[in-house]
Design a protein with these regions (language model features):
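The feature marks the mature, well-folded catalytic cores of soluble enzymes
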Residues: 1-283
Length: 283
């Protein structure tokens, strides 16, 4: 699989400039000033391109999974579902298809491993820790797969994480370094388990824990969802005290990268951030 450090272009949904014109203008200006090449994905129905765009194994090899997330099954949300095959055809990208149901936000490359939450089992009608299914995943990715826990106790709770995306918990920083969100503030037991699992596989995990008087949990979960294109990182900011500390975490964990922040409350209010709205590849 292509690593973030190897990528040189980022794709964005054609709907991003329609739905969020102010943010779009600021983001494109930042990309241009930062020297990040960007392109548009035509024919999308929502902005969350990370979830449905294919996995890049090599410069010319792409894997296309079945994008059937449970959170878009309701009739009122079906109109937001983009057909990945259609947009890839428009882009001239040839993909090798698979019947596996996978959500792109639940694919986090960490060196020789791919990290996914255990939601991938239920999405495919499998029992948790199904060894044969894990073997299929590993054959699919050509990587060892690490499964981390995910719990959604009440999907009707507006603050519940019903997505189950691993990119909302961790971000690989090269070598054996992994940066982890402040999930401990929300679910300490689950966060502890995630950290222990990653450490069992030899990773040095640093948690984003904030030293501020009143933490803003409405926003500070989203810092981990940053975008890296080559040695350049674009991460969220929200105009809160945690912004500076989050920037320091990302800079210290990625010392060879340049890091910029962008205000994105309007995007994060919809439960996603920079990684969710982007698809970076090597061309």
């Amino acid at each position: 699989m292509i690593k973030d450090i190897e990528t040189n272009v980022v794709y964005l949904s054609d709907k991003l400039q329609v739905f969020y014109p102010d943010f779009w203008g600021r983001l494109i200006k930042l990309f241009d000033e930062f020297g990040i090449l960007w392109k548009i994905i035509p024919g999308t129905n929502d902005i969350w391109v990370r979830d449905f765009m294919p996995i890049q194994l090599s410069e010319k090899e792409f894997l296309l999974y079945q994008y059937e997330p449970d959170y878009l099954q309701d009739r009122s949300y079906r109109k937001l579902k983009t057909d990945p095959s259609s947009v890839c055809s428009l882009l001239g990208i040839k993909c090798r298809p698979t019947k596996m149901v996978i959500d792109g936000g639940n694919i986090t490359l960490c060196g020789d491993y791919v990290v996914m939450t255990d939601k991938v089992f239920t999405e495919n009608g499998k029992k948790k820790d199904d060894g044969d299914f894990i073997a299929q995943l590993e054959n699919f990715f050509q990587k060892k797969v690490i499964i981390i826990p995910w719990h959604c106790i009440d999907p009707n709770d507006e603050n519940a994480d019903f997505f189950g995306h691993s990119d909302g918990f961790i971000h690989w920083c090269g070598g054996n370094k992994v940066l982890m969100s402040n999930h401990r503030e929300v679910d300490p037991e689950e966060a502890k388990e995630i950290k222990q699992i990653m450490e069992k596989y030899g990773f040095d995990v640093r948690e984003m824990l904030f030293d501020v008087k009143d933490q803003d949990l409405d926003w500070n979960w989203a810092y981990i969802n940053y975008l890296q294109v080559g040695n350049k990182i674009v991460m969220p900011a929200f105009g809160i005290p945690e912004d500076k500390q989050a920037l320091k975490y990302v800079q210290e964990c990625n010392p060879d990268c340049e890091v910029r922040q962008i205000r994105m409350r309007d995007i994060a209010a919809k439960c996603g951030a920079m990684h969710c709205i982007s698809w970076n590849i090597k061309e």
